[in-house]
């Protein structure tokens, strides 16, 4: 019933109007899995390769017909008649057939789409929801939790066309008792933030991830606006709602100078100075998590940042670790950061993603399942977060259907699991239990 009989790839459109790869995996019992690969804007240099055509006459060079051809050709041939329930074997077959260190032959976008579609088909053949199947693959059958959301309500950096350098300013509804309540709280703050920004004559157009993207005089001004919105919504900052930031500092790091350049504020910092700039923000506002607070290659700086802030707040590696167990292992050994952002298209298969989650948890690092700035209606990351009991999820703001699709799936899962999937709130955040 779980033997693969057909694999189909196609080119579809993501939330930024760019092509991406969608895959279908059909099983002999009539079961079908459908999945699409996401795409990032600010990407780590060591991510698995997203294969694009480079043909400027189609989609400005961003077409993915080469990756789709890989799905419909060699990948389909290799996986036909294989057992979809053996996820590790399927992923190994594709990785070995690709034969490159970074999946550059077929593209991580091709391999991942098939990997996820196969998992969905297998879960259907077993008559269970995807999150239950993922828990079994993870070796944690029956162990679930609902993730604390990080909601990106002000977008900057590579995710918006504004003057704000820090890429994401997020709220965490830690006072909620359930994911359903967390979503309501996030929505109320989001709408009150629009009122705050409008009252200041600011733009309320949204960025790639559904957050507002106004021009602001400083990063502190973004935090101040959110504080006002939280209070307008009737909540207490630091008790009901905490704050998180994704600096994506690699995007404003000067390779030639080794400095960090906040153009929006007209300020330049050394590595240690920028750590203390962030430290000052954490003293002014209840910021409990900072992601990519330095350039991905500034490991000495990260060691210093971890020494200064690591026992107080969660320090998340995204571009730093790129969901790669080899890099994460080195980070753990050197005491770099204390948390990892999990993006399965950074590594390119479900099996490798689960390995990164396990390694992080075994080392005492927290795990945050994440979307990308280029998304589709595919809500697999919601099931991944619950099925691995990851603890936290980052999937954008309270607008754009590509973002809310994930929140809506979490609401459905919570309804189905009830008390079997506790919502632990702030206890999931490193340094805040």
Swiss-Prot record:
Quaternary assembly: Component of the RNA degradosome, a multiprotein complex involved in RNA processing and mRNA degradation.
Residues that hold Mg(2+) according to the record: 246, 291, 318
CDD domains recorded: enolase
Name of the top EC class for this enzyme: lyase
Database matches in NCBIfam families: eno
Reaction(s) this enzyme catalyzes, per UniProt: (2R)-2-phosphoglycerate = phosphoenolpyruvate + H2O
Protein's job: Catalyzes the reversible conversion of 2-phosphoglycerate (2-PG) into phosphoenolpyruvate (PEP). It is essential for the degradation of carbohydrates via glycolysis.
Organism for this UniProt entry: Sodalis glossinidius (strain morsitans)
Annotated metabolic or biological route of this protein: Carbohydrate degradation; glycolysis; pyruvate from D-glyceraldehyde 3-phosphate: step 4/5
Major localization class: cytoplasm
InterPro entries assigned to the protein according to its UniProt record, in alphabetical order: Enolase, Enolase-like_C_sf, Enolase-like_N, Enolase_C, Enolase_CS, Enolase_N
Protein's recorded name: Enolase
Family: Belongs to the enolase family.
Cofactor: how and how many bound: Binds a second Mg(2+) ion via substrate during catalysis.
One BP annotation, GO: glycolytic process
Cofactor(s) of this protein: Mg(2+)
């Amino acid at each position: 019933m779980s033997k693969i009989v057909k694999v189909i790839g196609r080119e579809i459109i993501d939330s930024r109007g760019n092509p991406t790869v969608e895959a279908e995996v059909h099983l002999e019992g009539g079961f079908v899995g459908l999945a699409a690969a996401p795409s990032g804007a600010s990407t780590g240099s060591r991510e698995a390769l997203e294969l694009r055509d480079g043909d400027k006459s189609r989609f400005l060079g961003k077409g993915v017909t080469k990756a789709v051809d890989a799905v419909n050709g060699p990948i389909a041939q290799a996986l036909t008649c294989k057992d979809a329930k053996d996820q590790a074997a399927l992923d190994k077959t594709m990785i070995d057939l690709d034969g490159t260190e970074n999946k550059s032959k077929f593209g991580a976008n091709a391999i991942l789409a098939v990997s996820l579609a196969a998992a969905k088909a297998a879960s259907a053949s077993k008559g269970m929801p995807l999150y239950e199947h993922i828990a079994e693959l993870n070796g944690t059958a029956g162990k679930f939790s609902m993730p604390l959301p990080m909601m990106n309500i002000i977008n900057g950096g590579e995710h918006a066309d504004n003057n704000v350098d820090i890429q994401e300013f997020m709220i965490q509804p830690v006072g909620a008792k359930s994911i359903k309540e967390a979503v309501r709280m996030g929505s109320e703050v989001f709408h009150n933030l629009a009122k705050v920004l409008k009252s200041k004559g600011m733009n309320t157009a949204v960025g790639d991830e559904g957050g507002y993207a106004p021009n602001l005089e400083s990063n502190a001004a973004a935090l101040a606006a959110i504080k006002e919105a939280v209070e307008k919504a009737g909540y207490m900052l630091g008790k009901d709602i905490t704050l998180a930031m994704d600096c994506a500092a690699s995007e404003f790091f000067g390779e030639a100078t080794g400095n960090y350049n906040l153009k929006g504020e007209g300020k330049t910092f050394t590595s240690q100075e920028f750590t203390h700039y962030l430290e000052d923000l954490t003293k002014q506002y209840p910021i409990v998590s900072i992601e990519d607070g330095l350039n991905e290659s500034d490991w000495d700086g990260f060691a210093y940042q971890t020494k200064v802030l690591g026992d107080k707040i969660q320090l998340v590696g995204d571009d730093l670790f790129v969901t790669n167990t080899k890099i994460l292992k080195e980070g753990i050994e050197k005491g770099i950061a204390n948390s990892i952002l999990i993006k399965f298209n950074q590594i390119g298969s479900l099996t490798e993603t689960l390995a990164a989650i396990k390694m992080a948890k075994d080392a005492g690092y927290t795990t945050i399942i994440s979307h990308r700035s280029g998304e589709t209606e595919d809500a697999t990351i919601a099931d991944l977060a619950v099925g691995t009991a990851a603890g936290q999820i980052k999937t954008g703001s309270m607008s754009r259907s590509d973002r809310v699709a994930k929140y809506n799936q979490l609401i459905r899962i919570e309804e189905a699991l009830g008390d079997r999937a506790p919502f632990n709130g702030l206890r999931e955040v490193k340094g805040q239990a």
